[in-house]
């Protein structure tokens, strides 16, 4: 943020096939920030304080979910910015893109049973110290919708062990694993805890009228209350 009185500007990337960019913008606005549309074919990140990669089926999920989006000019610009500390949240397809781009370890594959899953899902917050989860308590259980066909998180045994040992499993499925993810993992973060990827959709849990509650809203307010101050000038 460049001025103390200005709201934080959170960029939301739109790919061909994105579905949830507008819902994400509404969630960002509900959190008190200004959503900024970022087109996949552009590479300008000037003036944004954080970036969200929303859910959907980028480029039709051809080859693999997120496999083509990783080569877009916007993701190419995000990689060095992310490594420099820009907070990034990848939701569902956005999580897949982050893994394909090498910003998070592991991969998201077909759900066990090969069925698309759409339901309200209980989660347990296990890493409340990330840029996007500072508003939650350690061990807090929340309810956020899931909707995906390729949400099964997989990684090599040593990667899984490192994630667990370093406390980088951000949220874990509770009350039934919807997709067969290793160790019930629903979301993870990078080593510096500025990048979070998760399969559940917090943007669909920011209003009692349209979602299962407002448990998702704090994922957007968290980045405003804490980490963005480190990027203010």
Curated annotation (Swiss-Prot):
Catalyzed chemical reaction(s): N(2)-formyl-N(1)-(5-phospho-beta-D-ribosyl)glycinamide + L-glutamine + ATP + H2O = 2-formamido-N(1)-(5-O-phospho-beta-D-ribosyl)acetamidine + L-glutamate + ADP + phosphate + H(+); L-glutamine + H2O = L-glutamate + NH4(+)
Glutamine amidotransferase type-1 domain mapped to chain residues: 9-233
GO MF annotation list: ATP binding; glutaminase activity; phosphoribosylformylglycinamidine synthase activity
Cysteines joined through disulfide linkages: none
Residues forming the catalytic site: 92 (nucleophile), 201, 203
A Pfam match: GATase_5
Subunit structure: Part of the FGAM synthase complex composed of 1 PurL, 1 PurQ and 2 PurS subunits.
The protein's name: Phosphoribosylformylglycinamidine synthase subunit PurQ
Species per Swiss-Prot/TrEMBL record: Frankia casuarinae (strain DSM 45818 / CECT 9043 / HFP020203 / CcI3)
């Amino acid at each position: 943020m460049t001025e103390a009185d200005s709201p934080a500007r959170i960029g939301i990337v739109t790919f061909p096939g994105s579905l949830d960019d507008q819902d994400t913008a509404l969630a960002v606005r509900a959190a008190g920030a200004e959503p900024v549309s970022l087109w996949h074919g552009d590479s300008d990140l000037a003036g944004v304080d954080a970036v969200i990669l929303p859910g959907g089926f980028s480029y039709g999920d051809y080859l693999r979910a997120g496999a083509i989006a990783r080569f877009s000019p916007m993701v190419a610009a995000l990689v060095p910015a992310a490594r420099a500390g820009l907070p990034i949240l990848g939701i569902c397809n956005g999580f897949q893109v982050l893994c394909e781009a090498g910003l998070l370890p592991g991969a998201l594959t077909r759900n066990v049973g090969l069925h698309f899953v759409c339901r309200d899902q209980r989660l347990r917050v296990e890493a409340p110290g990330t840029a996007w989860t500072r508003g939650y308590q350690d061990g807090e259980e929340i309810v956020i919708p899931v909707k995906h066909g390729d949400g099964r998180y997989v990684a090599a045994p040593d990667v899984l062990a490192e994630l667990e040992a370093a406390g980088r499993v951000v949220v874990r499925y509770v009350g039934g694993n919807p997709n067969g993810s290793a160790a019930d993992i629903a979301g993870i973060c990078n080593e510096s805890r500025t990048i979070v990827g998760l399969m559940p959709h917090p943007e669909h849990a920011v209003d009692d009228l349209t979602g299962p509650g407002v448990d998702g809203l704090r994922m957007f307010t968290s980045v405003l209350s804490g980490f963005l101050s480190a990027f203010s000038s």
